Design a protein with these regions (language model features):
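A short, surface-exposed interaction/processing loop segment used at functional sites
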Residues: 187-191
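Ankyrin repeat domain, specifically the short helix-to-loop turn at the C-terminus of the second helix
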Residues: 1-2, 24-33, 62-70, 96-102
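A surface-exposed partner-binding patch
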Residues: 77-182
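Conserved ankyrin/ankyrin-like repeat signature
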Residues: 21-22, 59-60, 92-93
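Ankyrin-repeat boundary/"N-cap" motif
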Residues: 2-13, 36-48, 74-80
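Internal alpha-helical scaffold/solenoid segments in large eukaryotic proteins
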Residues: 51-75
């Protein structure tokens, strides 16, 4: 058993737990810094740098990037380090990662071109551009609020070979629910 072939899972777990010493050792021994296969702990197949961003560990994110981590790799739900920082409202980390991402990913004209095949209703586009992005449900027992992505941060994802757009950044009490736009059905989905 060699670290270069089988060390990716352990490396990602070490980074997720903030164990810099073990992460350095595994990387020195050849672990894949961009490993992103699903397993029982990480079913969405994130990279180590995405996990560091999820845990708001800016020093770890910086170190991983210095070591060659690819911040453009998205997990199975379309999350990448930048979008995780946005979800976590970690502006310092989001700004840092945005400065390193391809410029056209944050260009509105390019976003319009990218999202055109999704046939989003004009009212939804306008709402995502102007907000409010936080929806309040004070009378509901289980979900008091949900926060949508801004138009520029809407994420593309694939589920069962269908292209979808992820519209929701966070929801009260349910961290793993998704609000999705299906261009094929021209409807909102939730998972």
């Amino acid at each position: 058993i060699t670290v270069d072939k089988f060390g990716g899972e352990a490396f990602r777990a070490a980074v997720s737990e903030g164990n810099t010493k073990l992460a350095r050792l595994l990387l020195e021994k050849g672990a894949d810094i961009n490993y992103h296969k699903p397993d029982m702990v990480f079913p969405n197949a994130p990279t180590a740098v995405t996990e560091a961003a999820r845990h708001k560990n800016l020093p770890m994110v910086r170190w991983l990037i210095e070591q060659g981590a690819d911040i453009t790799i998205a997990d199975k739900y379309g999350d990448r380090p930048y979008t995780v920082a946005v979800q976590n409202k970690n502006q310092e980390l989001a700004d840092y990662l945005k400065s390193l991402e391809p410029e056209d990913w944050h260009n509105e004209q390019e976003k319009v071109r990218q999202l055109m095949p999704y046939k989003l209703p004009a009212k939804l586009v306008e709402y995502l551009k102007t907000g409010p992005l936080r929806l309040e449900f004070p009378e509901q027992e289980w979900v008091k609020w949900a926060e949508l992505y801004s138009y520029m941060d809407v994420q593309e994802m694939t589920r069962k070979r269908k292209k979808l757009l992820s519209l929701m950044a966070a929801m009260d009490n349910y961290s793993d629910y998704l609000l999705l736009w299906s261009p094929r059905d021209k409807k909102l989905w939730y998972l």
